[in-house]
């Protein structure tokens, strides 16, 4: 019985690690999309930047882009 508990614990830990890896991949993908839009991912945009949203990473939820002068 103790062997089965150890295996269950390791499988559970592996699933948690896999979930973290897939979240990191999507955050990197969204950061690349923001880069293509000539923006960058930040927690807060500066006053002369516009929030376009889209990064959705835990620490950097916004894609900030410079405002265009009209």
Curated annotation (Swiss-Prot):
Question: What species is this protein from?
Answer: Pan troglodytes
S-S bridge residues:
41-55, 45-64
Q: Main site of residence?
A: secreted
Which terms are listed as keywords in the entry? Answer: Antibiotic, Antimicrobial, Defensin, Disulfide bond, Secreted, Signal
Give the GO biological process terms: defense response to bacterium; innate immune response
Subcellular location as annotated? Secreted
- Which residues constitute the signal peptide according to the record? 1-26
Protein name (Swiss-Prot/TrEMBL) = Beta-defensin 107A
Provide GO CC annotations from the record.
Answer: extracellular region
What phylogenetic lineage does the species belong to?
Answer: Eukaryota, Metazoa, Chordata, Craniata, Vertebrata
Q: Which family does it belong to?
A: Belongs to the beta-defensin family.
State its role: Has antibacterial activity.
């Amino acid at each position: 019985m103790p062997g089965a508990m150890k295996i269950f614990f390791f499988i559970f830990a592996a699933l948690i690690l896999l979930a973290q890896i897939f979240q990191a991949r999507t955050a990197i993908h969204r950061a690349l999309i923001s880069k293509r839009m000539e923006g960058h991912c930040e927690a807060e945009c500066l006053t002369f930047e516009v929030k376009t949203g889209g990064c959705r990473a835990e620490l950097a939820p916004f894609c900030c882009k410079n405002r265009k002068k009209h």
